[in-house]
């Protein structure tokens, strides 16, 4: 394994990209560093990948979110689906925890957008994908540091990096008002 130390916090997506840039294996596991998603699931992800899937994502059976986060999540995915129309099929209750094949990694690192939404890009790229269900354990320590403002900013960045439709709509409204 390899440890990559960044000089500063550049965001989750940039951290994942740094890991992808420096990975050398035939498959790469992507997971959040807080270990809320159980590392024990890695063997199941690898098993499915060995069955011939290019992407195997981990899907939470049940998601326990505060009410406001649940509402924001539903709004984001509804708006995302409306604006992106075809090409994106992001499974519900699926975060970044997954295994991707080397060919997926190579495509992702060739896409050098400054702002990226990896879940969306991986969905958009296609190839053979499947998910495995798991129970996410209740957080043992601490609280999520994810604020409402961060969620909204991340949602807007994700949407704008995936489609130009919102900019087009805003431009048209501006021209005709």
What are these regions (language model features)?
Residues 32-36:
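The conserved acidic donor/metal-binding loop of glycosyltransferases
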Residues 6-8, 12-22, 39-118, 137-156:
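Acceptor/aglycone-binding surface of glycosyltransferases and processive sugar-polymer synthases
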Residues 127-129, 135-138:
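Histidine/lysine/aspartate-rich catalytic loop segments that bind and position anionic ligands
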Residues 156-177:
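Alpha-helical bilayer-embedded segments of polytopic membrane proteins, i.e.
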């Amino acid at each position: 394994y390899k440890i990559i130390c960044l000089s500063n916090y550049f965001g989750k997506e940039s951290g994942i990209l740094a890991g992808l840039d420096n990975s050398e294996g035939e498959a790469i596991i992507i997971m959040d560093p807080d270990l809320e998603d159980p590392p024990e699931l890695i063997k199941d992800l690898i098993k499915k990948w060995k069955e011939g899937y290019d992407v195997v994502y981990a899907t939470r059976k049940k998601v326990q979110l505060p009410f406001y986060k649940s509402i924001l999540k539903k709004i984001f995915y509804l708006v995302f689906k409306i604006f992106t129309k075809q090409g994106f099929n992001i499974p519900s209750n699926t975060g970044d925890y997954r295994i991707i094949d080397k060919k997926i990694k190579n495509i992702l690192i060739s896409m050098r957008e400054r702002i990226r939404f990896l879940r969306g890009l991986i969905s958009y790229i296609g190839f053979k994908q499947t998910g495995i269900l798991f129970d996410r354990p209740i957080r043992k320590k601490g609280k999520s540091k994810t604020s409402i403002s961060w969620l909204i900013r991340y949602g807007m960045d994700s949407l704008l990096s995936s489609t130009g439709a919102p900019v087009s709509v805003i431009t048209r409204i501006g021209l005709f008002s």
